[in-house]
């Protein structure tokens, strides 16, 4: 979203205009704010989003899926650094973050809460460790044919 101070009233107006339930649009807004900060970070080239279809107006009209799943090169330090990125207050960001980290079988899980004004949205970020070269090879071979 463009560089603007957003208010709840702005989302309510867009909710009516786009015919999206307000709670769904709020959740989508928080997810997209997560991705906006992520895309401007040092991590943007070290992760591959597995479930990008959870983003976008059509998905918000149907149902919100508040889990983002990423593949990431194996590095146990990255999830903690990523969590710290979100816990830092950014003046230009309308969303404030709180969160915790936990280890999973093949990766890590961040349990975040994005707060926009007084409203809170839970967001789960799954980080699955995998050598991305294998995945990029599959993606490239699919694009060639």
Residue positions per predicted region:
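Compositionally biased terminal segments of proteins
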Residues: 1-145
């Amino acid at each position: 979203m463009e560089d603007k101070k957003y208010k709840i009233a702005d989302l309510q107006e867009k909710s009516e205009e786009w015919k999206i339930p307000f709670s769904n649009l709020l959740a989508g807004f928080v997810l997209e704010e997560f991705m906006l900060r992520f895309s401007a970070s040092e991590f943007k080239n070290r992760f591959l989003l597995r479930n990008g279809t959870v983003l976008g107006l059509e998905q918000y009209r149907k149902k919100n899926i508040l889990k983002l799943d990423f593949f990431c090169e194996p590095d146990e330090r990255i999830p903690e650094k990523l969590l710290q990125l979100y816990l830092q207050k950014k003046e230009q960001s309308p969303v404030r973050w709180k969160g915790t980290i936990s280890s999973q079988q093949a990766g890590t899980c961040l349990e975040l809460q994005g707060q926009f004004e007084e409203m809170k949205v839970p967001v789960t970020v799954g980080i699955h460790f995998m050598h991305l070269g294998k995945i990029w090879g599959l993606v490239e071979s699919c694009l060639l044919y």
